[in-house]
Amino acid sequence: LVGSEMCIRDRVIGIGETGLDYFYDTSPRKKQVEAFRKHIDASRESGLPLIVHTRSADRETCEILREETGKGAFSGVIHCFSVGREVAETALDLGFYISLSGIVTFKNAESLREIVRDIPLERLLVETDSPYLAPVPHRGQRNEPAFVRDTALFIADLKGVEFVEIVSQSGNNFFIILIN
């Protein structure tokens, strides 16, 4: 992305994936923050949603999103949500959507499932993050788009709603945020 002028092209529907990833700590944090803020500016200026990736950087991500919202509104999605409650609450407070991947189906993801139970359907998306993070029962395999069904089935059961409701609402949310 060279700048917000790149966003006016007809085929661009979002800015990102962008954000902070401190997990491996191989990219200088200062540079990540600078790039994240530039992408937020592009989102704000273009009106296109921001697709946010955050890993091992919950506090900093929330601080930046709050600060930047104070400079002017922008919308977005927390992509492949697998982090803490603070990120979910901040995102929802700022009008963002939260996208869930196969991680929610993993045996060790109970703390994530507790948060997901509280995410309103009107702010939820379902994704694959292919080729990574295949849901149970495909865990360990290369993820593919068809497996999104397994994630959606799991989320429907978790939230006590029909599968069709998850699919319908996630689809509607996709069009609201990304196709607008």
Task: Please annotate each region the language model reported.
Residues 148-180:
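Mid-to-C-terminal alpha-helical segments outside catalytic/metal-binding sites
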Residues 95-109:
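His/Asp/Glu-enriched short active-site or ligand-binding loop at hydrolase and phosphoryl-transfer sites
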